[in-house]
Amino acid sequence: MKNLIAELLVKLAEKEEESKELVAQVEALEIVVTALLRHLDPNTQQTLIASVEGALEGVQPESNVPQRDTELLQQYVKKLLRHPRT
């Protein structure tokens, strides 16, 4: 029983480490995208935003992807493009 608990704790620690790495990757990408958007002139920025939003509208998720996941992705992309980090 102790071995099982120890294995579960090790797996939990590994998952937590993976989660931290993913959070760091997402934050790094958010910083890069924000910096890139800020260096574009307003017309180019709006063209890029419209292009990304248009591409998302034209894509249908696979049936096994929960609707909530799709909505979260769309909301986050919109937030990132329209209201980047300050």
UniProtKB/Swiss-Prot annotation:
Keywords: Coiled coil, Cytoplasm, Stress response. One of its GO terms (cellular component) is cytoplasm. GO terms for biological process: cellular response to starvation. Disulfide bonds: none annotated. The keyword Coiled coil applies. InterPro entries: SigmaS_Anti-adapt_IraP. It comes from the Bacteria. It is found in: Cytoplasm. Residues 1-36 form a coiled coil. Inhibits RpoS proteolysis by regulating RssB activity, thereby increasing the stability of the sigma stress factor RpoS especially during phosphate starvation, but also in stationary phase and during nitrogen starvation. Its effect on RpoS stability is due to its interaction with RssB, which probably blocks the interaction of RssB with RpoS, and the consequent delivery of the RssB-RpoS complex to the ClpXP protein degradation pathway. Interacts with RssB. Belongs to the IraP family. This is Anti-adapter protein IraP. It comes from Cronobacter sakazakii (strain ATCC BAA-894) (Enterobacter sakazakii). The lineage of its organism: Bacteria, Pseudomonadati, Pseudomonadota, Gammaproteobacteria, Enterobacterales. The gene is iraP.
